[in-house]
Amino acid sequence: MSTKQHSAKDELLYLNKAVVFGSGAFGTALAMVLSKKCREVCVWHMNEEEVRLVNEKRENVLFLKGVQLASNITFTSDVEKAYNGAEIILFVIPTQFLRGFFEKSGGNLIAYAKEKQVPVLVCTKGIERSTLKFPAEIIGEFLPSPLLSVLAGPSFAIEVATGVFTCVSIASADINVARRLQRIMSTGDRSFVCWATTDTVGCEVASAVKNVLAIGSGVANGLGMGLNARAALIMRGLLEIRDLTAALGGDGSAVFGLAGLGDLQLTCSSELSRNFTVGKKLGKGLPIEEIQRTSKAVAEGVATADPLMRLAKQLKVKMPLCHQIYEIVYKKKNPRDALADLLSCGLQDEGLPPLFKRSASTPSKL
């Protein structure tokens, strides 16, 4: 028998009801996580006929085929029915549709969240085209910032939904808020484990930029480049995430954590990633219009590349990798030419600060 002592902060929290706004693959996967922690989980989807189909088949045949929904998960197209009684609210609506949702349907929901002080977990990734804002910033226009936290990290929907071991970060400006949500979202079987952080900016930047970089990784794969090139892209891309995070005032602690390096490595390395798949097709010569026309799922990196470049320009942050990916997606630049331009940048210092201080009296042994 284990003799390990558990403090109060280690004890998991269980709720009566949770609501997930956003019925895509990831929203459904998070509903499956919450089904282990709540008596009732409600998932909002705007199309009433599709809601009926999902509830009848007990499977999200639209976005997550093959995963049987837990018995305590219900889909609904009624916003008020969805949130009524909820003790936690998750937003997984695509970034470009978030503002429209609040403006059209958010009135009573906003009042409910404020009155009940319901914690809101932002799980959407990207940058809004019209304002260059991240998802938590958009929602922060409608709900008080102290209610908002961010979930980010390496988490393919199919693995989350089927209980394959997953670790993510939950970020809040108040570490105690993050720790409470950590106890709500982490499951008793430890298949879904959350780590708390205060770097909300780093989590949102990393979550958005990694999707653009994953397109680049896919392009390199489509061009027949190897794993060495992928590793270089991941590392240099991580520094672009670091620089943008710094420019936006983040403390950077999330950049080399689960939300940063962890999610970037995953998204850039697997065809389970929609963004990687889009990039691979671009690398093989398919036009972006055809790729998007034949794909049901949203590849957030495509929508993010343009506002990302405008934001970087505004902040005077150099992001050469992301710039070339933008050129491929939006300017129809030949992927091989984009690669050649990257390689012609000349020899440079690596640009990483030392991690350890060494006194002059202690010379290196190497």
Swiss-Prot record:
It catalyses: sn-glycerol 3-phosphate + NAD(+) = dihydroxyacetone phosphate + NADH + H(+). Keywords: Glycosome, NAD, Oxidoreductase, Peroxisome. Substrate binds at K125, R274, N275. It is an enzyme of class 1 (oxidoreductase). NAD(+) binds at G22, S23, G24, A25, F26, G27, F97, K125, A157, R274, V298, E300. It comes from the Eukaryota. It holds the Pfam family NAD_Gly3P_dh_C. It is found in: Glycosome. GO terms for cellular component: cytosol; glycosome. One of its GO terms (biological process) is glycerol-3-phosphate catabolic process. The active site is at K210. One of its GO terms (molecular function) is NAD binding. NCBIfam families: PRK00094.1-2, PRK00094.1-4. Belongs to the NAD-dependent glycerol-3-phosphate dehydrogenase family. Homodimer. This is Glycerol-3-phosphate dehydrogenase [NAD(+)], glycosomal.
